[in-house]
């Protein structure tokens, strides 16, 4: 049995030029596992705490030297000599050492980086691909699937400097036969969308997640541009390709109102649920994430009752990858899907528990990146190893996004005939 002989933390940069945490876990046989923690822009209020230094003289206060010191000090001392393959024991030990509800003492970014680095080291030690090791940890050995990519090709909200209120407009290649075919379809649509926007005299600069970020007349205008790009790429909207939204509604919710400032409109919960329902009737939108504010559970219930039978309603800020909150949502019939983000909860073990709870309740689980990413591609292995069926990892440019797609291509090649791609069957509704 291999043992952990050293743990090293360091400050590196994410895709927005902000510091984040990287950790190395070294084993007594020379194996090293490395992982980085991502960072979000639109964040749920109940997410685990990302520990920042607050020193305005360094990185505008966003340095992570405190989190790095926690890795190189107490976390290292805690885990030296431990078995890297006992993921649950490692994660529980770090959580207990932290001792807070939201990992505020050590930092979720510190705990997560070590948690993922240990998993990578353990996978190498067992001569397993990371996705296979994750499947074993998940209690589903050998059960894999290739996820349907939800490709964010128009960025708005907190992910772009434009007038579009809805944060993400995504395409899903549900009619593809394989993941690689689906990726090709999405890429072709992305390039056709650039031409569509250029023909309209619109900006084709990209946002945080690699999608285009033009000023548009309305959210519906964004959907119309994508529909045109799908057609020009030679695909049938609603059959080959479907659409998805991430409203990130908490970002434009204030005093009980949903304010679409880009359109000059304001709604109460009932009205905004009706607005979203209208969009699903005019476009083949099969998934809506954070359609209402994270605290507006009454509004979420209205939305779920209105369109939950035919549309996947994903809780991101709503559930923050937290089993306690998810359990309450399941009991109250709120939404029908959970977005899974490692750093919202802060460890691999707790992430797997959230996926398991969702699946047991008939909810889908969508594996997701953050807007502040690195070259770390662990979420690709997580999606395959848990057979989650769906992944959100941005658009078709920027290496911080493409690194995940490229890892999925490698995994598909490794799995061969076992690389099942289920397309539309992965979605609720």
UniProtKB/Swiss-Prot annotation:
Which cofactor does the UniProt annotation name? Mg(2+)
Source organism superkingdom = Bacteria
| Pfam families membership | Enolase_C, Enolase_N
Q: Indicate where this protein resides in the cell.
A: Cytoplasm; Secreted; Cell surface
Name the positions where (2R)-2-phosphoglycerate binds.
167, 341, 370-371, 392
Mention one GO molecular function.
phosphopyruvate hydratase activity
What pathway or pathways are given for this protein in its record?
Answer: Carbohydrate degradation; glycolysis; pyruvate from D-glyceraldehyde 3-phosphate: step 4/5
Mainly resides where? cytoplasm
The main enzyme category here is lyase
- Biological process (GO), any one: glycolytic process
**EC number, UniProt record:** 4.2.1.11
Q: Which InterPro entries match?
A: Enolase, Enolase-like_C_sf, Enolase-like_N, Enolase_C, Enolase_CS, Enolase_N
Which reactions fall under this protein's catalytic activity?
(2R)-2-phosphoglycerate = phosphoenolpyruvate + H2O
Q: Which residues form the active site?
A: 209 (proton donor), 341 (proton acceptor)
What do we know about how this protein assembles, alone or with others?
Component of the RNA degradosome, a multiprotein complex involved in RNA processing and mRNA degradation.
Spell out the family assignment given in the record's similarity comment. Answer: Belongs to the enolase family.
What protein am I looking at? Enolase
**Source organism of this protein record:** Pseudomonas putida (strain GB-1)
